Amino acid sequence: MTSRPSSDQTWQPIDGRVALIAPASAIATDVLEATLRQLEVHGVDYHLGRHVEARYRYLAGTVEQRLEDLHNAFDMPDITAVWCLRGGYGCGQLLPGLDWGRLQAASPRPLIGFSDISVLLSAFHRHGLPAIHGPVATGLGLSPLSAPREQQERLASLASVSRLLAGIDHELPVQHLGGHKQRVEGALIGGNLTALACMAGTLGGLHAPAGSILVLEDVGEPYYRLERSLWQLLESIDARQLGAICLGSFTDCPRKEVAHSLERIFGEYAAAIEVPLYHHLPSGHGAQNRAWPYGKTAVLEGNRLRW
């Protein structure tokens, strides 16, 4: 059995300010207000993007408004990190308008988020910019989970963002599922399976250097859609050059009457490309969503993922 991740809910001090942006779906006002209150409780100095409360259909503003907030977050000199408030949908729309020279000219500051934000994390990695796959900031403003243990895990996951920024956390537990068990070293990439698969064939296609450790997670998708997305994503990259595939949580993904488990389905694809498969990484849309450094070289060995 794999060990549990650290349940430490202690927030580490964050030097400088954190820029809060909403590059994807719109945010409920009450959730935003609760999030800002909790950031203040944890002593986080923040800058709120000008358009985070904007609405355009189901999005947090127009493409132009969301791009303006993202670029401004990198223009300000005292920003330590850029934390996305919510995922959902919309990040792919921003890619054609991103000024990479402008972003690269800023002092290093990671972009933080998951779910649809995975699209931006991959693009940042492609352009040599730091990123963190981890909870979005509005996780702080959500109503507590009914199960005390799950609420503790959520709070520990949110705190893991500050711990990673402080350079404290350096590993997460995993469990081997199939393929060889040799030591694997490569760049940590991936994120939300559906979001990344949807970008195949576009300028936002997954950046997957040889030897990469591909992390995958998802939420609310039936098995056939997950298999379709997996096939599409693997066909869009040189999948045989991956170092490993590591599964996070697949939350509320109904099996219904499917004969095979999700692990068996993923196992078939991993075996076909001769890539080792791991699972139980505490990453995804469940209560456990520990932060990890996107694009950083990591090592899979035994039941640990270290960076």
Swiss-Prot record:
Pathway: Cell wall biogenesis; peptidoglycan recycling. Keywords: Carboxypeptidase, Cell shape, Cell wall biogenesis/degradation, Cytoplasm, Hydrolase, Peptidoglycan synthesis, Protease, Serine protease. Homodimer. It catalyses: N-acetyl-D-glucosaminyl-N-acetylmuramoyl-L-alanyl-meso-2,6-diaminoheptanedioyl-D-alanine + H2O = N-acetyl-D-glucosaminyl-N-acetylmuramoyl-L-alanyl-meso-2,6-diaminoheptanedioate + D-alanine. It is found in: Cytoplasm. PANTHER family: MURAMOYLTETRAPEPTIDE CARBOXYPEPTIDASE (PTHR30237), MUREIN TETRAPEPTIDE CARBOXYPEPTIDASE (PTHR30237:SF2). One of its GO terms (cellular component) is cytosol. It is an enzyme of class 3 (hydrolase). Its main location: cytoplasm. Signal peptide: none annotated. It comes from Pseudomonas aeruginosa (strain ATCC 15692 / DSM 22644 / CIP 104116 / JCM 14847 / LMG 12228 / 1C / PRS 101 / PAO1). Releases the terminal D-alanine residue from the cytoplasmic disaccharide-tetrapeptide GlcNAc-MurNAc-L-Ala-gamma-D-Glu-meso-Dap-D-Ala, which is a murein turnover product. Probably also act on free tetrapetide. May be involved in murein recycling. One of its GO terms (biological process) is regulation of cell shape. GO terms for molecular function: muramoyltetrapeptide carboxypeptidase activity; serine-type peptidase activity. Pfam families: Peptidase_S66 (PF02016), Peptidase_S66C (PF17676). This is Murein tetrapeptide carboxypeptidase. Changing H285A: Loss of activity. Changing S115A: Loss of activity. Belongs to the peptidase S66 family.
